[in-house]
């Protein structure tokens, strides 16, 4: 068979599905078939083509399996119509066609131009006709899909898919609208009006068409991640939306109460309805509001209100809209100022400022937190999916490759006898036989062996190192058409021979050598240091030439710039060509920077050519010219940290591309919808042309983009409302469009930008570190200059990256630089280390020693004066006093009057200033006396903070000295006094920490600043090219040039011809312009803050030419410049900036947690556990009081109150402006009713709880306050109205009632205490506030300093209405200045305030300016002042809020199965039910019930079977007190510790010791007592609840065994003899052995799944026996399962034996609150074994007895037993001994959450036990055998402890069993409670003696020996050593097997007599011989421990 035949057979006939041989997965040939058969080919996946076909078949098969068998009830899958529909719908071109149709439809919708009054034109009419075509196409698509997939019933039906449903609705609505249009037209209508055909407005239905672009989302996969993460985030966002809604509702109702009807008074001319002002604003006829100052004007009502009556608080809905507008921080100051005009300055600012802080800064930043959390989670998922996919593909390729090779070798083996086979193949087959599998690359190289040059070139591109790197498709092409290749090879070979001949000539050789030398020299030159700096210099010159352009520049400068540009272009071209030649094209192109360079140079050449030819508009040219500026980024190449940043920015760009696409779709949809709704409607105001309209598609896009950025979106909304008839019912609905657009666009999509930025930066940090390492390794290998070939793929990349680099010397320098940088970065990372050190140092300042060296050259170190000063300045009173004086001096600065410089107040403050300065001077002199001035280490001036102090004081002193001379100098010095508050930083540690944080942040943000500034500079240069000198205009819009704008002109305000005004024509420039680079950067900075950019945009659109006026909409396409700038700078770079700040703060915060071994979450949880106090729950004793208490605490009562609050809210929200008197009366009556009901609630609660307990709860105090306030409110209203209801009005009232009105609203806040989710949110809010005090202090300081500077610099500017410095907004008083700064911080038109503060403004008439200085107020300093303040606030300070919020609210998106501090409140609440008195202790019996009531991850959850809960408790190690109780903190701490795995590995004592150290290190002030309580010290032998619960397992197990046996679950044949019964019992004991060990070594999770399965069966079984299971222990919590698994180092048993199945036993019905006694006996001397196991022994002295109650087995009633705690007189020798307890009690102890302790072997110790617990004894046994247990205290630990599981007591040495017992030592490992390896079963041979050899033990029966032997065989030798434990186990076996003890003994004797016993295993039986000596050895071994 020839090679070509092999090739042909690669695609054999498809074999049947159940074909023989390996399937397509293997790609192997099935054995040696006969020659010529088809089977010799590869199977289904033999070739890639074949594989894709196979995959396609497979997916089709899967899809068809999912399809509904019938569509539309009649079409089956075999129906030809349906089959053809399916094939059409799944045909790829069909999808493409539909997408193209959607796109075309969008274009058609965009081209449509809406006209006013529903007018139309021919183009629109034609577009309407085209719409029918689209509708037909979409209808056909829908019908086809419905036929193919079915309509709705089947899961894969058409409508079940969300996108399809959307399509379906759009199509149905479209058809519906067409039907309506066919209705009878009205007579006289134009034939094609766009409006209301058929008498019905179809426009609303047409609006649905605009949703069609959404279908593009389903067609673009990269959009899915973004859309998915947004969808996923919607669930937590819903929580936040509810919270925002709640805030809005509360503020709206408060607004109704305070501001109802306030906006309707303004100034009118007396006797007419004409408004007195051009721009009217509210006024107050009385009180402290604005009064009408003009003559003949009065303040009266009936004014609609500002914004045409939209902005007001007249009813609930208007109030909500106004509040929402304020939360968005757009136009909120206008509303505030109107309210101040209407009411005065007292109340409104509190309302609005608090609204902005809560609503905007806090609640809305939560959106960001949630989105960024969800986004990073979604991206991780996508990444994981991608990685998995890659891995699968790689494995698939490798398998395919193996298949090919096997197939080739096997085919050749078959065909070796064929003479046509090439020698290559023969050798190949030999290699195949020899076991060497050739790689694919080798095969191809052999095939191409003759083509030397060809293989030569492939070597450089294909890596020969690994076959996996070659894609499978290559291999396919090589094996597909070998015949053709042979022909090609022939022709190629002849060409090669010719080429070789030519190359061997001498000339060619010389030429090649010269060429090689020249290239090497070029390469060295290009990489040299000199070249690098030369290029940088050229870049700098290039930048300088472009930046020097400005408006009105002289001619010579223009010419110089042109020449310079051409010269520089030539130089850059030369550089590019040199690199191309020296490095070779492939290497040159490999570097991104080189490609970029090439693009810039080619752009430059193109631009120059076009200019010379004159073929292009200058506009485009100037833009191209600016592309050169991108060269600036060349600087970044050798600046490692900067290039890393640029790389991560480019990465972010990739992920942002899909978001931009989504954003674009979103904008298009809303623009089209806006055109449908508002097209041609914004023409209601004839006098003023609106710019932000929806009249054309481009204009609509701009308007939507403007709303998206949030700038003046409210103004557009007002226009929209006015277009629909103003603030009345239908018109107000329009606001829904704008609100949805704003929320989805601004809050969700734009926050996703920030989320992506934060996410990329966070993940980028890790990436850059890796890159650094890689760069270093690649740069370590210098390139070999004489080789052109690059050996491997990776090196090629490295070389590409370095191809621009320097010579070797340069590389070394670079490495050094990088190392330095890394060190710097490490320092930065350890910044918090420095911070911590500083924090440590600050307290020590009190005792800083006097430094060596003399002060002032005369005072030595021992000088008494110096010592006295030292004592004085370190005295705490002195420090506090200085702090007080700093605060007082700051207050005096704020109190100065900036206008009247010589006022009495200023004189007084001047004297204070003298005093303060003197005090500070004395302080500095004292400090200098102590520390010396500056010459030696530790001297005063060596500290930065001290230098700051010195500066502040010396400035004050100098300003006193030069009163008279230069005024400006004094002013500057006076301004510098503001730095005084900064001295407080040195005194307050927390503040110092925050300040250092800010500095670290500023340092790390440096790089981002540089990149942003470079980009900003670039855009500014482009702006200068485009707009220089084009922003001039004449005040008369009719004139367009400077020459024309002379004289004056008339204007008619509001179009009123009767009132003409004369104005002068002026030629003015725009405030923000692009005349030079600095102005351009300033203008662009304001654009990037989103303030006032639409005005600038429309100026740019209208810009015509230099020195010419604007032309309306001249260049609409120019808007692209602004949009690109906003997206790159404002959306992207600013968000990266913010993200950087957030990440830096987060990193700073986490650095604290780096040095203490606990992460942040662990630390917070542990802190909570240590600081938490139990809640007091008062339960009254008095029966009547108890009834009231029960009522008040009932669910029904709670729901009733909830309903009342809601009804009250509705009643409050019903108020409105101009309500009728009866309505008023009804409202007052309702208010009284509600107040009465709430008063009754308060009285009832006070009766139930007594005042002391009632007021202990904060919510109750709040309630009481509200009730009292409401009562006062009613009383005051009555007094004011003289007893008449319904007549209250603020103006007539004698007492101000607005304050008391608030109490009505505050009832709403009570709702917050009701919802669980909201409660958690609130709790986290309060936590955030706790994290914020120092941040808030820093913000307050910045505000203070800026406010005082503002007062000094801009306080003299006159207040003029109509300007930005006016009565509401000025610097004349300190509070006003702070409010103005707060306004700037929210970004509300800050740039206009800046312009109003520049020089040339009118001065305040009261200030003392000289003649002619009237217009000299203001200062150029305003630019620096406002920009620095805005940057500090908007970027740093506000982001501190964001950082804190994102930190604290990460739980909203975190995995809920991870324990966090927000879970721990539940523990307190449920604990209080068990410990109502808040004593902090509960019985250990209640612990299991308690933990089963708490949901995971903290508790076990009610689904956790009781037995598993007990096992978990065994592992938790909760310390048990001597009275049988556990403490609150210890239990909570143990839960946290176990759940978060804090120090749970290794030796318990060692782990405890380490944890104690960690806790002491972090919480230095923790009380020793508390620490000992939660982590017992090693010298105390603590008994834990876990150890106490251990023996519960034995009793529970045997009882279950007996019950199953009775029910016949363990097999039908009953044992015939006592011997076999005994064997069964012993076997069961052996089965239990591993379980006891597991329980004690924390292997509680392994069997859970099996337990659950059997547990259900057991629970059903139990339900029959027990009518009321879990009566009280299950709370109505939502069901959840404990999901997190704990990895355990123990091997798992393959299958649990039947008898081991768990589940709650019969007696689980016991209520959890029942209290059982513990019996305690005091002994004398505590003792402890070095093995660390607790010893349980019984003292032989007589004991006092305590009787328990007796009852029946399986008893279900709750038994109340007396709580008792014996007095332990440790000094005396008294002791207690209980009588045996009842059987039922024992069972209750077992199932009612208590069990027996673990046991240890007796020890040769003379001491007596300290106290003993004797319990759990069975009733009805032959002898009273209590389970003994001794608790020991107070002995130090033994000398050495072995490592083991933390839950297990450590032990000394390893337990080595006797040889016969243990087959291999390694199989059991460390034995009792140690590390277990190997199988858990050990099959051993034992020989049991009749009596124990040790004479000290009592004589025991054969049964005892057998039980001991079984225990020992199971590794429980220490238990076997305790005769009492053996007796208990024997008793349990006897009971379970229905034997008496005598029968058991005799059966055991029979077994021993036979000298055989089978091993107690279910699977097999081994004969064992028992020997006395062997057992003696075993016991001796146990003793040796």
Curated annotation (Swiss-Prot):
Annotated binding of Ca(2+), by residue: 330, 711, 1091
II-type repeats, residues: 515-761
Glycan attachment positions: 295
IV repeat residue numbers: 1182-1449
Region (Binding to the beta subunit) residue spans: 395-412
Principal location class: membrane
III repeats: 858-1140
Any one GO BP annotation for this protein: dendrite morphogenesis
Transmembrane portions of the chain: 93-111, 130-149, 162-180, 202-220, 240-259, 348-372, 530-549, 565-583, 592-610, 621-639, 659-679, 734-758, 877-895, 912-931, 944-962, 969-988, 1008-1027, 1118-1138, 1196-1214, 1230-1249, 1257-1278, 1296-1315, 1335-1354, 1422-1446
Subcellular location: Membrane
Polar residues bias spans: 1675-1687, 1713-1724
Residues covered by region (Phenylalkylamine binding): 1414-1457
Region (Disordered): 1-56, 455-490, 766-834, 1643-1729, 1746-1778
GO MF annotation terms: metal ion binding; voltage-gated calcium channel activity
InterPro entries, alphabetized: CAC1F_C (IPR031688), GPHH_dom (IPR031649), Ion_trans_dom (IPR005821), VDCC_a1su_IQ (IPR014873), VDCC_alpha-1_subunit (IPR050599), VDCC_L_a1su (IPR005446), VDCCAlpha1 (IPR002077), Volt_channel_dom_sf (IPR027359)
Tissue: Expressed in the inner and outer nuclear layers and the genglion cell layer of the retina.
PANTHER family: VOLTAGE-DEPENDENT CALCIUM CHANNEL TYPE A SUBUNIT ALPHA-1, VOLTAGE-DEPENDENT L-TYPE CALCIUM CHANNEL SUBUNIT ALPHA-1F
Assembly, per entry: Voltage-dependent calcium channels are multisubunit complexes, consisting of alpha-1, alpha-2, beta and delta subunits in a 1:1:1:1 ratio. The channel activity is directed by the pore-forming and voltage-sensitive alpha-1 subunit. In many cases, this subunit is sufficient to generate voltage-sensitive calcium channel activity. The auxiliary subunits beta and alpha-2/delta linked by a disulfide bridge regulate the channel activity. Interacts (via IQ domain) with CABP4; in a calcium independent manner.
The record's note on its domains: Each of the four internal repeats contains five hydrophobic transmembrane segments (S1, S2, S3, S5, S6) and one positively charged transmembrane segment (S4). S4 segments probably represent the voltage-sensor and are characterized by a series of positively charged amino acids at every third position.
Name recorded for this polypeptide: Voltage-dependent L-type calcium channel subunit alpha-1F
Organism: Mus musculus (Mouse)
């Amino acid at each position: 068979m020839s090679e070509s035949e092999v090739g042909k057979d690669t695609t054999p006939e498809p074999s049947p599905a159940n074909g023989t041989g390996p399937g397509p997965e293997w790609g192997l040939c099935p054995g040696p078939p006969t020659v010529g058969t088809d089977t010799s080919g590869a199977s289904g996946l033999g070739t890639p083509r074949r594989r894709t076909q196979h995959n396609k078949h497979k997916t089709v098969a899967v899809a068809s399996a999912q399809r509904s068998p019938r569509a539309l009830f009649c079409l089956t899958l075999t129906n030809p119509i349906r089959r053809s529909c399916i094939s059409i719908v799944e045909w790829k071109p069909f999808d493409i066609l539909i997408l193209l149709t959607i796109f075309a439809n969008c274009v058609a919708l965009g081209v449509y131009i809406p006209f006013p009054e529903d007018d139309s034109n021919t183009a629109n009419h034609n577009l309407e006709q085209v719409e029918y075509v689209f509708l037909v196409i979409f209808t056909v698509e829908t019908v086809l899909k419905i036929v193919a997939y079915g309509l709705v019933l089947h899961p894969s039906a058409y409508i079940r898919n969300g996108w399809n449903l959307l399509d379906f609705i759009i199509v149905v609505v479209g058809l519906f609208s067409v039907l309506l249009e066919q209705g009878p037209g009205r007579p006289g209508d134009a034939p094609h009006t766009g409006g209301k055909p058929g008498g019905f407005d179809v426009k609303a239905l047409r609006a649905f068409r605009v949703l069609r672009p959404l279908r593009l989302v389903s067609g673009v996969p990269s959009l899915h991640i973004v859309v998915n993460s947004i969808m996923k985030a919607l669930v937590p966002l819903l929580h936040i939306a509810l919270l925002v809604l709640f805030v809005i509702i509360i503020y709206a109702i408060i607004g109704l109460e305070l501001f109802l009807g306030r906006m309707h008074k303004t100034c009118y001319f007396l006797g007419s309805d004409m408004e007195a002002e051009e721009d009217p604003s509210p006024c107050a006829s009385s009180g402290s509001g604005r009064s009408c100052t003009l003559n003949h004007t009065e303040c009266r009502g009936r004014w609609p209100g500002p914004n045409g009556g939209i902005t007001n608080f007249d009813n609930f809905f208007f109030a909500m809209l106004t509040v929402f507008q304020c939360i968005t921080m757009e136009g909120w100051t206008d509303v505030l100022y109107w309210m101040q005009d209407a009411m005065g300055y007292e109340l409104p600012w509190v309302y609005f400022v608090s609204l902005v802080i809560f609503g905007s800064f806090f609640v809305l930043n939560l959106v960001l937190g949630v989105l960024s959390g969800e986004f990073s989670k979604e991206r991780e998922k996508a990444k994981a999916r991608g990685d998995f996919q890659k891995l699968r593909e790689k494995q698939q390729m490798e398998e395919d490759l193996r298949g090919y090779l096997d197939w080739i070798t096997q085919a050749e083996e078959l065909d070796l006898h064929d003479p046509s086979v090439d020698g290559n193949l023969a050798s190949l087959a030999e290699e195949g036989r020899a076991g060497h599998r050739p790689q694919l690359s080798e095969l191809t190289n052999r095939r191409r062996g003759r083509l030397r040059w060809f293989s030569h070139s492939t070597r450089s591109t294909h890596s020969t190192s690994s076959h996996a790197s070659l894609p499978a498709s290559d291999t396919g092409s090589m094996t597909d058409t070998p015949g053709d290749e042979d022909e090609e090879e022939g022709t190629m070979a002849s060409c090669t021979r010719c080429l070789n001949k030519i190359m061997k000539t001498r000339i060619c050789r010389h030429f090649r050598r010269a060429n090689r030398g020249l290239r090497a020299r070029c390469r060295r030159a290009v990489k040299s240091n000199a070249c690098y700096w030369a290029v940088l210099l050229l870049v700098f010159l290039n930048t300088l030439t472009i930046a020097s352009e400005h408006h009105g520049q002289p001619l010579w400068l223009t010419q110089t710039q042109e020449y310079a540009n051409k010269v520089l272009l030539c130089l850059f071209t030369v550089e590019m060509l040199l690199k191309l030649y020296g490095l070779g094209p492939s290497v040159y192109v490999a570097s991104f920077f080189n490609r970029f360079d090439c693009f810039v140079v080619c752009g430059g050449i193109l631009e120059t050519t076009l200019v010379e030819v004159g073929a292009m508009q200058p506009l485009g040219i100037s833009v191209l010219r600016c592309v050169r500026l991108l060269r600036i980024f060349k600087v970044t190449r050798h600046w490692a940290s900067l290039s890393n940043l640029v790389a991560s920015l480019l990465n972010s760009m990739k992920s942002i591309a899909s978001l931009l696409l989504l954003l674009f779709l979103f904008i298009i949809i809303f623009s089209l919808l806006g055109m449908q709704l508002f097209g041609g409607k914004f023409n209601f105001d004839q006098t003023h042309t609106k710019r932000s309209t929806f009249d054309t598609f481009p204009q609509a896009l701009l308007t939507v983009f403007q709303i998206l950025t949030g700038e003046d979106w409210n103004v557009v909304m007002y226009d929209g409302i006015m277009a629909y008839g103003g603030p009345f019912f239908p018109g107000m609905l329009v606001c829904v469009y704008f609100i949805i657009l704003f929320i989805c666009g601004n809050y969700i999509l734009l926050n996703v930008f920030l989320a992506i930025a934060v996410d990329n930066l966070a993940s980028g940090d890790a990436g850059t570190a890796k890159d650094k390492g890689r760069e270093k390794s690649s740069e370590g290998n210098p390139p070999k200059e004489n080789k052109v070939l690059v050996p491997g793929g990776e090196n090629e990349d490295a070389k590409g990256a370095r191809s621009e680099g320097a010579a070797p010397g340069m590389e070394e320098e670079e490495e050094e630089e990088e190392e330095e940088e890394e060190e710097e970065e490490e320092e930065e990372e350890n910044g918090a280390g420095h911070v911590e050190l500083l924090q440590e140092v600050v307290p020590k300042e009190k005792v800083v020693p006097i430094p060596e060296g003399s002060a002032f050259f005369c005072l030595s170190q021992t000088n008494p004066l110096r010592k006295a000063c030292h004592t004085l300045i370190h005295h705490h009173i002195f420090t506090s006093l200085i702090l007080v004086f700093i605060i007082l001096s700051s207050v005096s600065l704020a109190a100065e009057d900036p206008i009247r410089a010589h006022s009495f107040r200023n004189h007084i403050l001047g004297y204070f200033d003298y005093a303060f300065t003197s005090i500070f001077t004395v302080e500095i002199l004292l400090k200098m006396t102590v520390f010396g001035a500056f010459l030696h280490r530790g001297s005063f001036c060596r500290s930065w903070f001290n230098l700051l102090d010195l500066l502040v004081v010396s400035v004050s002193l100098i300003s006193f000295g030069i009163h008279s001379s230069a005024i400006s100098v004094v002013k500057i010095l006076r301004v510098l006094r503001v730095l005084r508050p900064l001295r407080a930083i040195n005194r307050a540690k927390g503040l110092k920490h925050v300040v250092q944080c800010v500095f670290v942040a500023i340092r790390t943000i440096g790089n981002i600043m540089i990149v942003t500034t470079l980009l900003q500079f670039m855009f500014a240069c482009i702006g200068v090219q485009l707009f220089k000198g084009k922003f001039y205009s004449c005040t008369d819009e009719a004139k367009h040039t400077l020459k024309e704008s002379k004289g004056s002109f008339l204007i008619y305000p509001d179009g009123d011809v009767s009132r003409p005004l004369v104005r002068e024509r002026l030629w003015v420039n725009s405030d923000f312009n692009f005349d030079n680079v600095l102005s351009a950067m300033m203008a662009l900075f304001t654009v990037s803050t989103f303030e006032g950019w639409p005005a600038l945009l429309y100026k740019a659109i209208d810009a015509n030419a230099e020195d010419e006026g604007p032309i309306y909409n001249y260049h609409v396409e120019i808007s692209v410049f602004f949009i690109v700038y906003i997206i790159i700078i404002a959306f992207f770079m600013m968000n990266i900036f913010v993200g950087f700040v957030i990440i830096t703060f987060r990193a700073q915060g986490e650095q604290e947690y780096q040095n203490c071994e606990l992460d942040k979450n662990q630390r917070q949880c542990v802190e909570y556990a240590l600081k938490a106090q139990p809640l007091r729950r008062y339960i009254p004793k008095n029966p009547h009081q108890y009834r009231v208490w029960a009522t008040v605490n009932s669910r029904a009562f709670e729901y009733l109150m909830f309903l009342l609050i809601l009804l009250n809210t509705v009643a409050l929200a019903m108020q409105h402006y101009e309500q009728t008197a009866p309505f008023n009366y009804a409202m007052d009556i309702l208010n009284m009713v509600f107040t009465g009901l709430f008063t009754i609630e308060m009285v009832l609660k006070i009766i139930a709880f007594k005042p002391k307990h009632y007021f202990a709860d904060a919510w109750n105090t709040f309630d009481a306050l509200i009730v009292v306030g409401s009562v006062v409110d009613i009383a005051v209203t009555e007094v004011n109205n003289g007893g008449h209801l319904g007549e209250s009005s603020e103006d007539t009232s004698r007492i101000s009632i607005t304050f008391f009105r608030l109490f009505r609203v505050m009832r709403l806040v009570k709702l917050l205490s009701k919802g669980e989710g909201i409660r958690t949110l609130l709790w986290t809010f309060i936590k955030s506030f706790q994290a914020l005090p120092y941040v808030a202090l820093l913000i307050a300081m910045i505000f203070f300093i800026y406010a005082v500077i503002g007062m000094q610099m801009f306080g003299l500017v006159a207040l003029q209405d109509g300007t930005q410095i006016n009565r509401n907004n000025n610097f004349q008083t300190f509070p006003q200045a702070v409010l103005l700064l707060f306004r700037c911080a929210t970004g509300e038109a800050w740039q206009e305030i800046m312009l109003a503060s520049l020089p040339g403004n009118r001065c305040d008439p009261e200030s003392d300016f000289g003649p002619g200085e009237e217009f000299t107020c203001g200062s150029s300093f305003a630019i620096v002042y406002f920009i620095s303040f805005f940057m500090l606030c908007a970027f740093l300070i506000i982001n501190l809020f964001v950082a804190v919020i994102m930190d604290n609210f990460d739980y909203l998106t975190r995995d809920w199965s991870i324990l966090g501090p927000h879970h721990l409140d539940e523990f307190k609440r449920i604990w209080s039910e068990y410990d109502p008195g808040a004593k902090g202790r509960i019985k250990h019996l209640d612990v299991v019930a308690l933990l089963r009531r708490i949901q995971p991850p903290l508790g076990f959850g009610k689904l956790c079977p009781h037995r598993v809960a007990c096992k978990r408790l065994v592992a938790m190690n909760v310390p048990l007190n001597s009275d049988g109780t556990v403490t609150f903190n210890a239990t909570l701490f143990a839960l946290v510790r176990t759940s978060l795995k804090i120090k749970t590995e290794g030796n318990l004592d060692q782990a405890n010791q380490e944890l104690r150290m960690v806790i002491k290190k972090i919480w230095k002030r923790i009380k020793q007592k508390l620490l000992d309580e939660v982590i017992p010290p090693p010298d105390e032998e603590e008994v834990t609840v876990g150890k106490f619960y251990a023996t519960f397992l034995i009793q529970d197990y045997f009882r279950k065994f007996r019950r199953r046996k009775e029910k016949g679950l363990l097999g039908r044949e009953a044992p015939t003899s006592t011997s076999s019964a005994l064997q069964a019992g012993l076997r069961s004991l052996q089965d239990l052995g591993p379980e006891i060990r597991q329980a004690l070594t924390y292997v509680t999770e392994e069997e859970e799944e099996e337990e659950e399965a059997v547990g259900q069966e057991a629970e059903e079984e139990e339900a029959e026996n027990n009518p009321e299971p879990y009566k009280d222990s299950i709370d109505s919590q939502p069901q959840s399962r404990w999901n997190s698994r704990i990895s355990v180092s123990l091997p798992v048993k393959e299958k649990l034996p039947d008898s081991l199945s768990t589940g709650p036993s019969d007696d689980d019905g016991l209520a959890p609150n029942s209290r059982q006694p513990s019996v305690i006996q005091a002994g004398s001397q505590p003792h402890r074994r070095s093995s660390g196991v607790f010893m349980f022994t019984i003292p032989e002295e007589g004991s006092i007895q305590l009787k328990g109650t007796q009852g029946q087995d399986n008893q279900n009633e709750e038994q109340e037993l007396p709580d008792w705690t014996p007095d332990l007189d440790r000094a005396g020798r008294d002791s207690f001994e209980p009588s045996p307890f009842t059987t039922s009690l024992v069972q209750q102890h077992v199932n009612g959450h208590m069990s027996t302790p673990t046991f240890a072997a007796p020890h040769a110790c003379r001491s007596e036990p300290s106290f003993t617990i004797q319990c759990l004894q069975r009733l009805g046994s032959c002898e009273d055998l209590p389970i003994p247990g001794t608790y020991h205290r107070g002995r130090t630990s033994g000398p050495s402890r072995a490592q083991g599981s933390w839950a297990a007591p450590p032990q000394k040495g390893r337990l080595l069993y006797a040889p016969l017992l243990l087959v291999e030592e390694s199989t059991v490992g460390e034995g009792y409670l140690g590390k277990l390896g190997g199988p858990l079963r050990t099959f051993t041979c034992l020989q049991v003696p009749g009596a124990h050899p040790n004479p000290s033990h009592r004589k025991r029966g054969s049964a005892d020996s057998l039980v001991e032997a079984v225990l020992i065989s199971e590794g429980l030798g220490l238990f076997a050593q305790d005769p009492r434990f053996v007796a208990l186990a024997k008793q349990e076996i006897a009971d379970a097997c229905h034997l008496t003890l005598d029968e058991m003994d005799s059966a055991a004797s029979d077994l021993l007599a036979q000298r055989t016993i089978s091993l107690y295993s279910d699977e097999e039986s081994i004969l064992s011989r028992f020997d006395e000596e062997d057992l003696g050895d075993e016991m001796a071994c146990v003793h040796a421990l």
